[in-house]
Curated annotation (Swiss-Prot):
Residues 59-81 are annotated as: Disordered. Keywords: Activator, Cytoplasm, Repressor, RNA-binding, Translation regulation. PANTHER family: CARBON STORAGE REGULATOR. This is Translational regulator CsrA. Belongs to the CsrA/RsmA family. It comes from the Bacteria. Homodimer; the beta-strands of each monomer intercalate to form a hydrophobic core, while the alpha-helices form wings that extend away from the core. A key translational regulator that binds mRNA to regulate translation initiation and/or mRNA stability. Mediates global changes in gene expression, shifting from rapid growth to stress survival by linking envelope stress, the stringent response and the catabolite repression systems. Usually binds in the 5'-UTR; binding at or near the Shine-Dalgarno sequence prevents ribosome-binding, repressing translation, binding elsewhere in the 5'-UTR can activate translation and/or stabilize the mRNA. Its function is antagonized by small RNA(s). Residues 59-71 have a biased composition (Polar residues). The keyword ATP-binding does not apply. GO terms for biological process: mRNA catabolic process; negative regulation of translational initiation; positive regulation of translational initiation; regulation of carbohydrate metabolic process. It holds the Pfam family CsrA. GO terms for cellular component: cytosol.
Length: 81
């Protein structure tokens, strides 16, 4: 992890197209602004995790709708017991 110190009004660059600017500090909260191209998604971590969880759930539902049921055993072994 790269650790940087920035003051209010200072900016850091992520690659050539994304800039992050410190807009203000109040107590233990830091206000930042992010400039990025529209094709680059920018989310708070908790929102990103929720999106990832929802995508995983949608993927599982699609597999179930298509009849792709995950199994942890071999069907032949199960029925020949």
């Amino acid at each position: 992890m790269l650790i940087l110190t920035r003051r209010v009004g200072e900016t850091l660059m992520v690659g050539d197209e994304v800039s992050v600017t410190v807009l203000g500090v109040k107590g233990n909260q830091v206000r930042i602004g992010v400039n990025a191209p529209k094709d680059i998604a920018v989310h708070r971590e908790e929102i990103y995790q929720r999106i990832q969880h929802e995508r995983a759930m949608q993927s599982q539902m699609q597999h179930l709708e298509q009849g792709n049921f995950p199994t942890s055993f071999d069907d032949d072994d199960f029925f020949n017991r």
